[in-house]
Amino acid sequence: MIREIVMPLQLTLTEGILPKGQEKLAFARLSEAMLKWHGLTGNKVMAPNVIGEYRVLPRDETFSGMQEAPVAIIEWKVPSFAFTDREVQLGYFAEATDIIFEMSGGKQPRDRIFINVVHTVDGAWNFNGHAMTNAEIGEQVAKGG
């Protein structure tokens, strides 16, 4: 069985949602939660492969309901076998929402914290410098446990 793995995180925040300078901590906490929910905390192969970026956008550049609004968007791009377990989906989404809500001091409404997952096609994942299948990724991750 292939163990689920995680990869790039793109965190997009409207300016002012988090106290200035807390974006890196939010990124780290969201990444750690992802590893935890996939049973990969401490995995030596996965830790260096959790990559990504955060962006802080001006208030007039983020929208909800087609209106300007402060939003937090947590988006993961992962191999097609990640996030397939409903318990992982529910658990991670709840924890990630809590992280942003708490770090905002309770100011960011939970209904303006959005999370989604984008799956890649099997074999179209760049891991260790070349395209790998889900099975090949699973073999590499198993070595890091």
How should each PLM-predicted stretch be described?
Residues 2-145:
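A domain-level signal for the structural core that forms small-molecule/cofactor-binding pockets
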